[in-house]
Amino acid sequence: MERTFIAIKPDGVQRGLVGTIIGRFEQKGFKLVGLKQLKPSRELAEQHYAVHRERPFFNGLVEFITSGPIVAIVLEGEGVVAAARKLIGATNPLTAEPGTIRGDFGVNIGRNIIHGSDAIETAQQEIALWFSPAELSDWTPTIQPWLYE
């Protein structure tokens, strides 16, 4: 079953949106298999955003993501990577559709509440970076037969 990595950024944590955001994913039918709150080290943040290292916003992004606690999440479900991206919405909250997490709660591109893996391969890398195998739960929800054929 497909998995994705989600991070509720410091602005989402500070604004008390963690439960609401997790609820949206659960209501969609995705299974929570990893969950933890932490204040990322600079090294971890730089590894996570390494693809942006040469971009002008890199240092600001690393400073922001390490400025407070984040909630790291692993979700599981059919098509979860693409579906989670749709639920999250466009990177810029000002252009994100109403009903998406960023459209409903985001303020600006630098404070856009949440990160979600953009591809299956990226999700695998991000999950391995943020979680050890022992931190992930393998379980079967009783509603699974009602979700998947």
UniProtKB/Swiss-Prot annotation:
It is an enzyme of class 2 (transferase). Its main location: cytoplasm. ATP binds at residues 9, 57, 85, 91, 102, 112. Its cofactor is Mg(2+). Pathway: Purine metabolism. One of its GO terms (cellular component) is cytoplasm. GO terms for biological process: CTP biosynthetic process; GTP biosynthetic process; UTP biosynthetic process. The active site is at 115 (pros-phosphohistidine intermediate). InterPro entries: NDK-like_dom, NDK-like_dom_sf, Nucleoside_diP_kinase, Nucleoside_diP_kinase_AS. It is found in: Cytoplasm. Pfam families: NDK (PF00334). It comes from the Bacteria. The keyword Nucleotide-binding applies. Keywords: ATP-binding, Cytoplasm, Kinase, Magnesium, Metal-binding, Nucleotide metabolism, Nucleotide-binding, Phosphoprotein, Transferase. GO terms for molecular function: ATP binding; metal ion binding; nucleoside diphosphate kinase activity. It catalyses: dZDP + ATP = dZTP + ADP; a 2'-deoxyribonucleoside 5'-diphosphate + ATP = a 2'-deoxyribonucleoside 5'-triphosphate + ADP; a ribonucleoside 5'-diphosphate + ATP = a ribonucleoside 5'-triphosphate + ADP. Homotetramer. Major role in the synthesis of nucleoside triphosphates other than ATP. The ATP gamma phosphate is transferred to the NDP beta phosphate via a ping-pong mechanism, using a phosphorylated active-site intermediate. Belongs to the NDK family. This is Nucleoside diphosphate kinase. The gene is ndk.
